[in-house]
Amino acid sequence: MKVVCMLLIIGVLMLGCGKICHHDHYGFKATAQFYPENDSIAVGDTIWFTSSVPVKNTDTISNQIINYGGASNFSTDINFNSIEDPLKISEIEGAIDSFSFISMVGSLKENPFEPKGSLAISYSEGSVYYQNLFAFVALKKGIYAVTVVDIENSYKRCAKAYVSLTLSNINKHQEFLKITYYPGSPFGDTIPEIEQTHTYCFKVY
């Protein structure tokens, strides 16, 4: 009986020695880029997408440097759409079938929730950066908008991070978006702020 009691006491003590799981929330900033930065390309030409997120990053909430290595669900979506006058079409069309894709770093797959207009990308973790790199080759003529979505829910044990991904391109060729956004357009008179920082446009001829 004494042995059983001792084992129970030891078990309780061991459970009590476990680390407390802090439900921390972090906000990080990072960039993505499309290159070469041409406003027009020919069918058969290639555009590259690259994004690097530091493993050790400054938390926008606490302003402290956080080591966020070993995180899970470090992934997001990239949306591909044709740019057309909304008054001349019934809905915005996805443009995944206008390109062929080559994944180089990280992973790239069809987004099951939006298979015609979106790809799901996952970052590969290195010692310094989480990275994703892929190429896409133009197959069809048209005017296109590619929008990078922020990483919204990346987890590390009990912690959760939101990563704001803005484009570092000097020229995002957003004059093409005026085809969609103009006075009287059902989508609005002006280009939304989120698209100003997250959308890259180009023409395929």
Region locations from a protein language model:
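Sec-dependent signal peptide recognition
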Residues: 2-9
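C-terminal motif of bacterial Sec signal peptides marking the signal peptidase cleavage site
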Residues: 13-16
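Start-of-domain marker
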Residues: 18-77
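Short structured motifs
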Residues: 33-37, 114-120, 130-133, 185-187, ...
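A short, structured loop/turn motif at beta-sheet edges
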Residues: 39-45, 137-144
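Residue-level recognition of well-ordered beta-strand positions that form the cores
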Residues: 50-54, 79, 147-149, 203
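Structured domain cores in non-transmembrane regions
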Residues: 57-142
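Glycine-rich, aromatic-bearing surface loops/beta-hairpins
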Residues: 133-134, 144-205
